[in-house]
Amino acid sequence: MPNLDLSRYGITDVEEIVHNPSYDLLFEEETRDDLQGYEKGTVTDLGAVAVDTGIFTGRSPKDKYIVRDDTTRDTVWWADQGKNDNKPLSTETWNELKGLVTEQLSHKRLFVVDTYCGANEDTRLAVRFITEVAWQAHFVKNMFIRPSEEELENFEPDFVVMNGAKCINPKWQEQELNSENFVAFNLTEKIQLIGGTWYGGEMKKGMFSMMNYFLPLKGIASMHCSANVGQEGDVAVFFGLSGTGKTTLSTDPKRALIGDDEHGWDDDGVFNFEGGCYAKTINLSKEAEPDIYNAIRRDALLENVAVDDNGVVDFDDNSKTENTRVSYPIYHIDNIVKPVSKAGHAKKVIFLTADAFGVLPPVSKLTKEQAQYHFLSGFTAKLAGTERGVTEPTPTFSSCFGAAFLSLHPTQYAEVLVKRMEAAGAEAYLVNTGWNGTGKRISIKATRAIIDAILDGSIEDAEFVQLPHFNLAMPTELAGVEDSSILDPRKTYEDDGEWDVRAKDLAERFVANFEKFTDTDNGKALVAAGPQL
C-alpha cells in the first residue's frame, strides 16, 4: 500500500483523502452545486467541464523561485546570471512559504493524485499532487502519465507538489519577493509549492522545469518540442515557441503522435514526459483542427473559455484571455504511439520560427554548428495585429526554444542535444512559418509540403543556394511547393534592397543576443555559424 501519511509533508488533521479519484468521481466533485468561485466547473454541450482560473490565465514567471542551497548553488542557471525566471530563495523564506501552504491544506478534505512524469521507467519522476480543488486533480490526471493499478500499489513519490491556490503570502514585501503569489521549488526536499495562482499550467510546467534539471545532468536531452513517428519508425522532433506550429505540424494523419510539448531523448530514443495534451483553443474550429476539436469531450477540461447559459462554448471569444486552453488525456487523439508514448531515435530535428521580419527562408538545412547556434538563439518574432500595413515586429530570443523552463545553463542542453543528434545521424532544419516580402504569412499548405519533403528525405535531392548574411542553405525547389520563388525570401520583395536592409537589421539582433554565450570557448566558436555583419 502507498504511504498516505501527509504529516511527513507538514499537512495535519486531514478530514478525508480522495486518493487517485476516477474520472467519473472527479466529474461529480468539480460540478457540485455547493461549490463557488474558481472551484466550480460548468458542464458544456461538448461533454467537457469548463473552469475559470481568475486573473491568472497564464503562468506567473515573476513569481517563480528555487531554493538556493548546496544542491542547487552551482548547478542552477540563476536569474541574476542570465535572462530567466530562476530567482533564488532562501531556505528560511521557503520554510515560511511551506508553512502557509501546509496550513492551507491541513484540516481539509484533500485530493491526492499519484502520477509519473516521463514515459521511460528508468528516468521517470513519480510525482504526487496534493490539492483541495477537484478540477486541479482532474488537470494533473489528464496531463501526467497515469500509473497502472499494480504500479499504484507500491507508489512512493520522488517529488511532491502541494497546490495551495487559495493561500497568499502576506509577508512578500518583507521577504523581498515579487508579489503575494508564489511558485517555489526545493530540489533538496523535492517539493513544489503553489500559492495564490489558480492556473493549471503551473503544475505542468513546474514538473517540466524539474525534468529539465535532472535529465541533462544524466546526459539525457530534455526538450520543449513535439514529436511524431512515421510508419517506418522514423522519428521527428519539432522545437518551437508558442504560436510557431509545434502542435499543428506534429499532428499529421500520416504519422503517429508521440507527444505535443515535452520530451526526453536517451539511449533508447525519444519519449514523452506527459500523458496528455494542453492545447490552445482560441478560434478553434472542427474544420481546421479536427483532432483537437474531437478530443474535447467528457474527461477533457476547458480553461477560461466563454460558455453561455446553455453550456455552449464560443471558442472565438477572447474576453477572458487569448490563452484559452483544454487539457485531455492523450488517448483522446486517435493516431498516437501506443501503449507507451515513446519511439526510437530522431532522424529529423526541426526548429520552428515565425519570422515577422520577412528575412528567413521557409526552410534551410543546418550544419551541426548552425544547429547549436539556432538552438541557443531560440528566435521567433511577433507582429502586433493591425488592420493593414506591417507594424514593427517584436523579436523574441528564448534559449533552446523554452528559456522560461530551463533550470540549467542553455549550453548544457545544446551539448546534450548535439551528442544525441550525432549518435543518431540526425539532420537539423530551420523552418520559418512566419511572413515574407508579400506581407502575408507563409501558407500552412506550403509549410506542410516542406515538412513532408524533410520527413520523406526528398529535400536532400534538392539543389541548395546560400542566403547572404545568414549563410543558410536554401533549396531552390521542393515537391509540393507550387511557387518555388517563396523558398528564397529575397524573391518575395519587389525591391531587392528592402530584404537586404531587413536582413542586416535582424542579423544585428542575432549577434547582440548571442553575445551572452561568448563567455565560453564553445560559445565563441559558434559565432561563426551565425549571421555575419
Curated annotation (Swiss-Prot):
A molecular-function term among this protein's GO annotations: phosphoenolpyruvate carboxykinase (ATP) activity
A single Gene Ontology CC term: cytosol
InterPro entries given in the database record: PEP_carboxykinase_ATP, PEP_carboxykinase_C, PEP_carboxykinase_N, PEPCK_ATP_CS
Cofactor note: Binds 1 Mn(2+) ion per subunit.
Gene Ontology annotations of biological process type: gluconeogenesis
Cellular compartment(s): Cytoplasm
Keyword ATP-binding: yes
Residues that hold substrate according to the record: 59, 199, 205, 325
Required cofactor(s): Mn(2+)
Residues the entry annotates as binding Mn(2+): 205, 224, 261
EC number assigned by the record: 4.1.1.49
Catalytic activity: oxaloacetate + ATP = phosphoenolpyruvate + ADP + CO2
Alphabetical UniProt keywords: ATP-binding, Cytoplasm, Decarboxylase, Gluconeogenesis, Lyase, Manganese, Metal-binding, Nucleotide-binding
Source superkingdom: Bacteria
UniProt keyword Nucleotide-binding present: yes
Subcellular location, principal: cytoplasm
Sequence similarity: Belongs to the phosphoenolpyruvate carboxykinase (ATP) family.
Subunit composition and interactions: Monomer.
Function: Involved in the gluconeogenesis. Catalyzes the conversion of oxaloacetate (OAA) to phosphoenolpyruvate (PEP) through direct phosphoryl transfer between the nucleoside triphosphate and OAA.
Record-linked NCBIfam families: pckA (TIGR00224), PRK09344.1-1 (NF006819), PRK09344.1-2 (NF006820), PRK09344.1-3 (NF006821)
Name this protein carries in UniProt: Phosphoenolpyruvate carboxykinase (ATP)
Species the sequence originates in: Idiomarina loihiensis (strain ATCC BAA-735 / DSM 15497 / L2-TR)
Name of the coding gene: pckA
